[in-house]
Protein backbone atom coordinates (compact mmCIF):
# COMPACT_ATOMS: atom_id res chain seq x y z
CA UNK A 1 0.00 0.00 0.00
CA UNK A 2 0.99 3.65 -0.22
CA UNK A 3 1.15 4.16 3.54
CA UNK A 4 4.24 5.91 4.87
CA UNK A 5 4.39 4.19 8.26
CA UNK A 6 3.59 0.80 9.73
CA UNK A 7 2.52 0.22 13.33
CA UNK A 8 3.85 -3.13 14.54
CA UNK A 9 1.39 -4.48 17.09
CA UNK A 10 2.67 -8.06 17.31
CA UNK A 11 5.85 -10.06 17.52
CA UNK A 12 8.38 -11.33 20.00
CA UNK A 13 11.77 -10.24 21.14
CA UNK A 14 13.13 -12.90 18.76
CA UNK A 15 11.51 -11.64 15.55
CA UNK A 16 10.90 -7.92 16.03
CA UNK A 17 14.26 -6.99 14.53
CA UNK A 18 13.48 -8.82 11.28
CA UNK A 19 9.98 -7.33 11.13
CA UNK A 20 11.39 -3.81 11.49
CA UNK A 21 14.07 -4.55 8.90
CA UNK A 22 11.49 -5.70 6.29
CA UNK A 23 9.33 -2.62 6.85
CA UNK A 24 12.26 -0.23 6.59
CA UNK A 25 13.53 -2.04 3.47
CA UNK A 26 10.14 -1.27 1.89
CA UNK A 27 10.79 2.43 2.50
CA UNK A 28 8.31 2.79 5.35
CA UNK A 29 8.74 4.07 8.89
CA UNK A 30 8.54 1.31 11.50
CA UNK A 31 6.81 2.04 14.81
CA UNK A 32 6.86 -0.74 17.40
CA UNK A 33 4.15 -0.97 20.06
CA UNK A 34 6.47 -1.52 23.02
CA UNK A 35 3.61 -2.67 25.26
CA UNK A 36 2.61 -5.56 22.95
CA UNK A 37 5.89 -7.23 21.97
CA UNK A 38 6.28 -10.55 23.77
CA UNK A 39 9.42 -10.53 25.87
CA UNK A 40 9.57 -6.72 25.95
CA UNK A 41 6.26 -5.75 27.48
CA UNK A 42 6.56 -4.89 31.16
CA UNK A 43 10.34 -4.47 30.83
CA UNK A 44 10.27 -0.70 31.18
CA UNK A 45 12.91 1.57 29.74
CA UNK A 46 15.25 -1.28 28.83
CA UNK A 47 12.68 -2.38 26.24
CA UNK A 48 12.90 1.04 24.61
CA UNK A 49 16.70 0.85 24.69
CA UNK A 50 16.48 -2.52 22.94
CA UNK A 51 14.11 -1.25 20.27
CA UNK A 52 16.32 1.76 19.56
CA UNK A 53 19.63 -0.09 19.50
CA UNK A 54 18.90 -3.63 18.33
CA UNK A 55 16.04 -3.06 15.88
CA UNK A 56 16.64 0.52 14.70
CA UNK A 57 12.89 1.18 14.84
CA UNK A 58 11.94 4.71 13.84
CA UNK A 59 9.66 5.10 16.81
CA UNK A 60 7.57 3.49 19.50
CA UNK A 61 3.93 3.34 20.42
CA UNK A 62 3.02 3.03 24.08
CA UNK A 63 0.33 3.87 26.58
CA UNK A 64 3.01 4.42 29.22
CA UNK A 65 4.24 8.00 29.73
CA UNK A 66 7.60 6.90 31.16
CA UNK A 67 8.38 4.91 27.99
CA UNK A 68 7.36 7.84 25.81
CA UNK A 69 9.63 10.17 27.78
CA UNK A 70 12.58 7.77 27.58
CA UNK A 71 12.08 7.16 23.85
CA UNK A 72 12.15 10.92 23.26
CA UNK A 73 15.47 11.10 25.11
CA UNK A 74 16.81 8.47 22.69
CA UNK A 75 15.64 10.42 19.65
CA UNK A 76 12.81 8.08 18.68
CA UNK A 77 9.53 9.35 17.28
CA UNK A 78 6.88 8.76 19.92
CA UNK A 79 3.22 7.84 19.57
CA UNK A 80 1.25 7.79 22.81
CA UNK A 81 -1.86 5.65 22.63
CA UNK A 82 -4.95 6.55 24.66
CA UNK A 83 -8.20 4.67 25.12
CA UNK A 84 -11.07 7.16 25.25
CA UNK A 85 -13.79 5.72 27.41
CA UNK A 86 -15.38 8.80 28.95
CA UNK A 87 -14.86 12.50 29.68
CA UNK A 88 -12.24 11.72 32.34
CA UNK A 89 -10.10 9.79 29.85
CA UNK A 90 -10.58 12.64 27.35
CA UNK A 91 -9.15 15.11 29.87
CA UNK A 92 -6.31 12.68 30.64
CA UNK A 93 -5.28 12.83 26.98
CA UNK A 94 -5.11 16.61 27.16
CA UNK A 95 -3.17 16.52 30.42
CA UNK A 96 -0.79 13.59 29.81
CA UNK A 97 0.12 13.88 26.14
CA UNK A 98 2.60 16.73 26.36
CA UNK A 99 5.71 14.61 25.73
CA UNK A 100 4.53 12.57 22.74
CA UNK A 101 5.12 13.57 19.13
CA UNK A 102 1.82 12.05 18.03
CA UNK A 103 -1.35 11.01 19.86
CA UNK A 104 -3.14 7.80 18.87
CA UNK A 105 -6.72 7.56 20.10
CA UNK A 106 -8.96 4.54 20.32
CA UNK A 107 -11.61 3.96 19.23
CA UNK A 108 -11.01 5.94 16.08
CA UNK A 109 -14.60 5.96 14.81
CA UNK A 110 -15.56 9.04 16.84
CA UNK A 111 -15.40 12.11 14.59
CA UNK A 112 -16.96 14.49 17.12
CA UNK A 113 -14.46 13.49 19.80
CA UNK A 114 -11.57 13.73 17.34
CA UNK A 115 -12.69 17.23 16.38
CA UNK A 116 -12.90 18.38 20.01
CA UNK A 117 -9.58 16.80 20.93
CA UNK A 118 -7.77 18.28 17.93
CA UNK A 119 -8.78 21.71 19.26
CA UNK A 120 -7.28 20.96 22.68
CA UNK A 121 -3.89 19.42 21.84
CA UNK A 122 -1.02 20.56 19.66
CA UNK A 123 0.17 17.15 18.47
CA UNK A 124 -1.16 15.41 15.38
CA UNK A 125 -3.86 12.82 16.05
CA UNK A 126 -4.10 9.30 14.67
CA UNK A 127 -7.44 7.49 14.87
CA UNK A 128 -7.25 3.74 15.57
CA UNK A 129 -9.63 0.94 16.33
CA UNK A 130 -13.18 0.15 15.25
CA UNK A 131 -12.68 1.71 11.82
CA UNK A 132 -14.81 -0.68 9.79
CA UNK A 133 -15.36 1.06 6.45
CA UNK A 134 -14.24 3.92 4.25
CA UNK A 135 -16.86 6.19 5.81
CA UNK A 136 -15.22 5.75 9.24
CA UNK A 137 -11.80 6.57 7.79
CA UNK A 138 -13.05 9.65 5.94
CA UNK A 139 -14.95 10.81 9.02
CA UNK A 140 -11.86 10.57 11.22
CA UNK A 141 -9.70 12.41 8.69
CA UNK A 142 -12.31 15.12 8.11
CA UNK A 143 -12.60 15.63 11.88
CA UNK A 144 -8.90 16.39 12.27
CA UNK A 145 -6.98 13.11 12.42
CA UNK A 146 -3.86 13.24 10.24
CA UNK A 147 -3.90 9.47 9.73
CA UNK A 148 -5.67 6.28 10.71
CA UNK A 149 -4.35 2.96 11.92
CA UNK A 150 -6.29 -0.16 11.04
CA UNK A 151 -5.67 -3.88 10.70
CA UNK A 152 -8.28 -4.06 7.92
CA UNK A 153 -6.30 -4.76 4.74
CA UNK A 154 -9.19 -3.65 2.54
CA UNK A 155 -9.08 -0.21 4.20
CA UNK A 156 -5.33 0.05 3.51
CA UNK A 157 -6.22 0.41 -0.16
CA UNK A 158 -9.31 2.60 0.34
What residue ranges belong to the model's regions?
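Glycine-rich phosphate-binding active-site loops on the catalytic face of alpha/beta enzymes
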Residues: 6-12, 66, 103-110, 130-158
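Signature of uroporphyrinogen-III synthase
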Residues: 17-44
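Catalytic beta/alpha-barrel core
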Residues: 4-13, 31-40, 54-65, 78-88, ...
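Phosphate- and divalent-cation-binding pockets in alpha/beta enzyme and binding domains
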Residues: 18, 70, 113-116
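Short beta-strand/loop segments at the ligand-binding rim of alpha/beta enzyme cores
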Residues: 25-35, 56, 73-83, 118-128
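Catalytic cores of alpha/beta
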Residues: 1, 43-53, 92-98, 112-121, ...
